[in-house]
């Protein structure tokens, strides 16, 4: 249920960097802000401590205190790298054959196979255990896959060029709304008038919510 209420900011990591540049921003803290301060027209969702802990610690150096939160954290890791790889393949930055053979052998040669391998590994190694975890072999393969993605996708000049466009777009949006707050939706204009939040925070709230519907 928690994963349904927080969404990634537009353009993923590039969007997060842009929002952090114009105003200190971290998506896990923003996710908690959404469920506490923005949803239900500012009333929040009145979630339990356990759910809020899972949201805040789903992708930080901290660790969720509940098994449910640990499931969210590890699921985020699995989905993140597989979605990025799938996007890179569909975008022509990578092909399946570019993935090192040892990683294809360990994890699978398609997005579906990799996800199945990772999910089954987590289930098998977490059964009757006090923590949610992967096997050491699969965790090593995941680290190697992440290193491969950094070298070939995240730092790829073609991908970086598109990210730079996204960063510039978000920075322009921020500057525009900072100068023209009258065009913000009603809930954000009311927040400007009635809350103690800084104007920059409220503009970040609006831009960070620009996901699929925009």
Protein language model annotation of sequence segments:
Residues 28-214:
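Histidine-centered, transition-metal-coordinating active-site segments
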